[in-house]
């Protein structure tokens, strides 16, 4: 669902992710000072693997929702919803994700996804992401140090 947003005071967050080699696939490692931020970083990293985010403008905002039975399935379904947003109309490639609801008791996420429709002439084509996997998925929470990390393997 498309939502209204204001470009005033619109800031992009610091990049807190990396890509790790994995046999025939790629592992995304996202981190942050909260679990919410680590999830957001992991989602942006997935888009960054599909195209160079420097070429993406923030023209539209869509809202997605994801539900799970535990944190791992919530992360899986969150990334799967983002992949669907890219793979079907509006073919949105996101430069910023803002989770507006992060309910870890009921395992629900609502997220504003900022970006624009993917265009071959404008956006360099990266590697196609076929699917999200549970393989070697990790969610690490160090509450005392305010350090949260997620590791997800995406099928390419």
From Swiss-Prot:
Phenotype reported upon loss of the gene: Larval lethal. Severed axons in RNAi-mediated knockdown class III dendritic arborization (da) neurons of larvae, display decreased regeneration. RNAi-mediated knockdown in larval class IV da neurons glial cells also impairs axon regeneration.
InterPro entries recorded: Archease, Archease_dom, Archease_dom_sf
GO process terms (BP): positive regulation of axon regeneration; tRNA processing
Annotated positions binding Ca(2+): 25, 155-156
Alphabetized UniProt keyword annotations: Calcium, Metal-binding, tRNA processing
One cellular-component annotation, GO: tRNA-splicing ligase complex
GO molecular function: metal ion binding
Its job: Component of the tRNA-splicing ligase complex required to facilitate the enzymatic turnover of catalytic subunit RtcB. Plays an important role in a RNA repair and splicing pathway which controls axon regeneration in response to peripheral (PNS) and central nervous system (CNS) injury, by activating splicing of Xbp1 to promote axon regeneration in response to axotomy.
Family in the record: Belongs to the archease family.
Record protein name field: Protein archease-like
